[in-house]
From Swiss-Prot:
The keyword Cell membrane applies. It is found in: Cell membrane. One of its GO terms (cellular component) is plasma membrane. The lineage of its organism: Bacteria, Bacillati, Bacillota, Bacilli, Bacillales. It catalyses: di-trans,octa-cis-undecaprenyl diphosphate + H2O = di-trans,octa-cis-undecaprenyl phosphate + phosphate + H(+). GO terms for biological process: cell wall organization; peptidoglycan biosynthetic process; regulation of cell shape; response to antibiotic. Bacitracin is thought to be involved in the inhibition of peptidoglycan synthesis by sequestering undecaprenyl diphosphate, thereby reducing the pool of lipid carrier available. HAMAP family: Undec_diphosphatase. Keywords: Antibiotic resistance, Cell membrane, Cell shape, Cell wall biogenesis/degradation, Hydrolase, Membrane, Peptidoglycan synthesis, Transmembrane, Transmembrane helix. It comes from Bacillus cereus (strain ATCC 10987 / NRS 248). This is Undecaprenyl-diphosphatase 3. It is a multi-pass membrane protein.
Length: 259
């Protein structure tokens, strides 16, 4: 894989990690549609590090606060919200990955993501701010994130939807969702590094790794800041229509054996 291909995958990872449209599903599509080489496990890991860097930069004040106050309510909320994903991920990760990395299943998963995004605005706008979030809220939001073990189910989409249903206001829903993404991204990186050290990763140039990581970080930061502002006044339906269209297109191409 050359540096330009790594740059493209970094853009895809950075934008789609935080827009509610599934990063894993889009990376799968990007490799096929642009006929890119398989990125390799090591580059996948570095792309996740790039998006993690984006979150750290955007939430630098919050992370400094968490370091200074490790037993704060915010830290406990993040721990409670992470528990469902940890349990599901450790128990069923390999099973779900084996059944999900085909065009047909990814197409259906995009349709499911679209359904939840469309239904997000059916409830009345909530008013909960960060200080109002309960541990029950965090656990339920985290449980929705655990569903994103399916590759084309959007983690950010599911957590934002759950947060809106739990009556968080729109800005806080996106804000907490992205903050909660940090443990999930860290967990994915750890699991991928285990595979890397077990010799499952393909070799790739250091230039491609650096370019892909920085690309994911840059575009990830843009996506986080834009999405939080966007959700203040806009519906998630546009994303629902997008992933529905994408899912229908993928299924059509699969059934006609074009893709």
């Amino acid at each position: 894989m050359n540096w330009l291909e790594a740059f493209i995958l970094g853009i895809i990872q950075g934008l789609t990690e935080f827009l509610p449209i599934s990063s894993t599903g889009h990376l799968y599509l990007g490799r096929h549609l642009f006929q890119l080489d398989e990125a390799g496990l090591f580059l996948d890991t570095m792309l996740h590090i790039g998006t993690l860097l984006a979150v750290f930069i955007y939430y630098k004040k919050e992370f400094i606060y968490l370091i200074k106050n490790p037993f704060s309510k915010l830290m406990l909320l993040l721990i409670v919200g992470t528990i469902p994903a940890v349990v599901i991920g450790l128990l069923f990760k390999d099973f779900f990955e084996d059944i999900s990395k085909t065009g047909i299943t990814i197409g259906w998963e995009f349709l499911v993501t679209g359904f939840f995004l469309y239904m997000a605005d059916k409830x009345k706008n909530g008013r909960k701010k960060m200080d109002d979030i309960t541990y029950k809220d965090a656990f339920i939001i985290g449980s929705f994130x655990a569903v994103a073990i399916f590759p084309a189910i959007s983690r950010s989409g599911m957590t934002i939807v759950a947060a809106l249903w739990r009556k968080l206001d729109r800005e806080t829903a996106a804000y907490f969702s992205f903050l909660l993404s940090t443990p999930a991204i860290v967990g994915a990186i750890i699991l991928q590094f285990v595979d890397v050290f077990q010799g499952k990763a393909e070799s790739i140039s250091s230039t491609s790794l650096i370019v892909g990581t920085l690309s994911a970080a840059f575009f990830g930061y843009i996506a986080v800041s834009w999405m939080i502002q966007y959700l203040k006044r806009h519906s998630l339906k546009v994303f629902a229509y997008y992933v529905w269209g994408l899912g229908i297109l993928i299924l059509t191409l699969q059934f006609t054996r074009v893709f």
